[in-house]
């Protein structure tokens, strides 16, 4: 690699809107994020499951598709 053309990569503090802080590597000194693994619904278990069955039924009804069950 050439000398002097790469940015300095150092430890950075990441601050979330929920108040959580952690460190990571970055070319910036600090980062601010809106959501992290401590407050994201997928990781906290508060995730809503979307039922796509209603969409499939609507499509079948719209195009007259009959199930052969």
From Swiss-Prot:
Its cofactor is Zn(2+). Zn(2+) binds at residues 16, 18, 36, 39. Gene3D superfamilies: Ribosomal protein L31. PROSITE patterns: RIBOSOMAL_L31 (PS01143). Binds 1 zinc ion per subunit. It holds the Pfam family Ribosomal_L31. GO terms for molecular function: metal ion binding; rRNA binding; structural constituent of ribosome. Belongs to the bacterial ribosomal protein bL31 family. Type A subfamily. PANTHER family: 50S RIBOSOMAL PROTEIN L31, CHLOROPLASTIC, LARGE RIBOSOMAL SUBUNIT PROTEIN BL31C. Part of the 50S ribosomal subunit. Binds the 23S rRNA. This is Large ribosomal subunit protein bL31. It comes from Ruminiclostridium cellulolyticum (strain ATCC 35319 / DSM 5812 / JCM 6584 / H10) (Clostridium cellulolyticum).
